[in-house]
């Protein structure tokens, strides 16, 4: 036994993991094995077994930094480290951080057993850190991991797991094996493959995504819509407007929702037309109406504001609330003034939704975000509201305008104010001083 190994053993007996790490780093392992000096003579198999056990002791009892340092030792030990590391990785009772390090270290070993173990962890673990580590480890193994997983696609029993594992390795090498399962009988296999393939800009993929729009499984259609929605570069070439707007009528809400998002991101009036056609239909349920309102908000054109204004006239409170919020988030200067006046007209209307406190509160917040001086009079009017939350939101919005404090002081001296407004102005001025 070398002198350094003897010192390492003593440090382990003392529980001095930091010192043990220092000695382990000095041992002639891996590339350093041929550079041994008198103190660190070449190690035999028995010595290597002892080094492995010492390193495992640090992994078991050390703190994060000590585990981080000892992780560098295991790859130098070679294949003898694989089995005990896999045992740690698969021990559900073991410390999660230790299992995380075991998996991370295994990512340094390009070995079929390692790949199988990491794949199993991806399938069974409910801990996000562990599964993320396993995916990263598989990715670091590169083509060998892809080849091993691709071979599992031939077996129906392992196909879903292999597809899920391949989907975690975002490398171009996974495209071909995943393309081989996009028509698999199992919907979960198809949807997983479609989701992963959508990450790549490869000419083989768009036709697959278009075909998947007609899949009988909603999960597959949903992933295809999401993937195509990210391909703005192919919007006209693939006629995505006409392909995706059909999915606005899908029986599955999540598919409809993703189709609306994709159309909204396109930012075209034609997309707004398609969204409004469904939004105004009495058959469209309120949750979907809200999704479509949000999507219209992303289009950001004057026509969008026209459609949102028309929708306000017959909207439920829930839908009207979302429209108010969407209009309040308008950032384009040319549209802000229009949005402000749409909201003012709505407040002054006889529509039932406009009379509710929650809508008035949202109106105040929207005007504060828009920052258009044309909303000041409407905000002052809200100070007369009997609901505290409406008044407080109006006050908060008024503080965004530099001249309103002076205007409120002048109003406070006006004897013609209604008692409710006079009280609201007084409260606002008092709040201003806080």
Predicted regions and their residues:
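Short inter-helical turns and helix N-cap capping residues of alpha-solenoid HEAT/ARM repeat scaffolds
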Residues: 15-16, 62-63, 92-95, 125-127, ...
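N-terminal accessory/assembly segment that mediates macromolecular interactions
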Residues: 60-61, 72
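Amphipathic alpha-helical scaffolding segments comprising HEAT/armadillo-like alpha-solenoid repeats
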Residues: 3-6, 43-60, 79-91, 111-125, ...
């Amino acid at each position: 036994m070398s002198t350094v190994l003897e010192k390492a053993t003593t440090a382990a007996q003392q529980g001095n993991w930091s010192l043990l790490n220092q000695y382990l780093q000095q041992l002639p392992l891996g590339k350093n094995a041929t550079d041994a000096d008198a103190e660190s003579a070449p190690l035999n198999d028995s010595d290597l077994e002892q080094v492995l056990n010492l390193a495992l002791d640090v992994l078991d009892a050390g703190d994060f930094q000590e585990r981080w340092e000892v992780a560098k030792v295991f790859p130098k030990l070679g294949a003898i480290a694989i089995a005990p590391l896999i045992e740690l990785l698969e021990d559900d009772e073991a410390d999660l951080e230790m299992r995380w390090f075991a998996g991370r270290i295994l990512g340094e070993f390009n070995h079929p057993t390692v790949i199988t173990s990491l794949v199993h962890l991806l399938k069974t673990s409910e801990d996000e850190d562990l599964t993320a580590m396993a995916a990263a480890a598989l990715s670091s193994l590169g083509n060998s991991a892809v080849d091993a997983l691709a071979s599992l696609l031939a077996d129906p029993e392992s196909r879903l797991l292999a597809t899920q594992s391949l989907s975690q390795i975002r490398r171009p090498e996974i495209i071909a094996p995943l393309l081989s399962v996009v028509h698999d009988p199992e919907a979960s296999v198809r949807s997983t493959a479609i989701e992963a393939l959508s990450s790549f800009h490869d000419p083989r993929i768009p036709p697959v995504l278009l075909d998947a729009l007609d899949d009988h499984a909603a999960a597959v259609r949903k992933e295809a819509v999401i993937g195509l929605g990210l391909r703005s570069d192919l919007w006209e070439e693939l006629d995505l407007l006409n392909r995706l707007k059909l999915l606005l009528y899908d029986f599955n809400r999540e598919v409809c929702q993703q189709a609306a998002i994709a159309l909204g991101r396109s930012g075209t009036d034609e997309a707004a037309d398609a969204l409004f056609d469904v939004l105004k239909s009495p058959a469209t349920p309120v949750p979907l109406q809200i999704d479509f309102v949000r999507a219209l908000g992303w289009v950001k054109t004057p026509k969008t504001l026209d459609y949102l204004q028309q929708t306000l006239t017959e909207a439920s409170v829930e839908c009207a609330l979302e429209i108010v919020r969407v209009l309040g988030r308008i950032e384009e200067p040319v549209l802000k003034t229009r949005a402000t006046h749409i909201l003012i007209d709505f407040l002054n209307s006889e529509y039932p939704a406009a009379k509710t406190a929650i809508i008035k509160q949202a109106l105040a917040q929207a005007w504060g975000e828009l920052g258009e001086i044309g909303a000041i009079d409407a905000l002052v009017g809200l100070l007369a509201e009997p609901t505290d939350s409406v008044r407080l939101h109006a006050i908060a919005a008024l503080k965004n305008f530099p001249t309103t404090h002076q205007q409120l002081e002048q109003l406070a001296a006006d004897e013609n104010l209604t008692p409710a407004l006079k009280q609201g102005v007084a409260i606002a001025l008092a709040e201003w001083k806080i």
